[in-house]
Design a protein with these regions (language model features):
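N-terminal accessory segment detector
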Residues: 1-92, 96-103, 145-150
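Short terminal or interdomain "cap/linker" segment that borders an active site or interface and mediates
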Residues: 78, 86, 123-150
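Long, amphipathic alpha-helical coupling/dimerization segments that relay conformational signals between
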Residues: 98-126
Length: 150
């Protein structure tokens, strides 16, 4: 029985690696190749579009979405009256941040901006801050409470 479980887990791990490899091929090579210099801006707006398609009502649900999308472990670090700071970690982040190739986290930034905009009812904008030494990405989402969504 233990051997069967071990074999299933090994197969699952190989499957996950294939999925990760395919995902990274698309994200790290193909998309930037197609979009060129506009990659960060288009990924940001794509993230906003994803958030509109999959709106969530709480910050906890945002965190759950990141986990389900295999984007990594999202954590809220700080919140003020007009700003929210997140931190994202995952094995993929480690490999992306370590690599010398240019990587963007604008898909995630756009997603965060739109979800916070939806939840707070004000226009929001997000900024990514890769921290290579710590192998993670920090996001700052800012909003103006006077700039309400109509």
């Amino acid at each position: 029985m233990k051997e069967q479980i071990s074999a299933e887990l090994t197969h699952l791990t190989e499957s996950e690696n294939t999925t990760v490899f395919g995902y990274e091929l698309l994200r790290g090579f193909l998309i930037p190749e197609i979009l060129g210099k506009d990659t960060p801006e288009i990924l940001y707006w794509a993230g906003k579009k994803l958030a509109r398609k999959y709106p969530v009502e709480t910050q906890e649900e945002i965190i759950d979405f990141f986990t389900q999308a295999s984007w990594g472990d999202l954590e809220i670090k700080n919140e003020t009256k007009d700003e929210l700071e997140f931190e994202l970690t995952s094995p993929l982040m480690v490999s992306r941040v370590k690599s010398k190739a240019e990587h963007f986290f604008q898909l995630e930034a756009g997603f965060l901006a739109q979800q916070i905009e939806h939840q707070k009812g004000v226009v929001a904008e997000a900024f990514e801050h890769p921290v290579k030494k710590l192998q993670k990405v920090q996001f700052t989402v800012k909003w103006d409470r006077k700039d309400k969504i109509e």
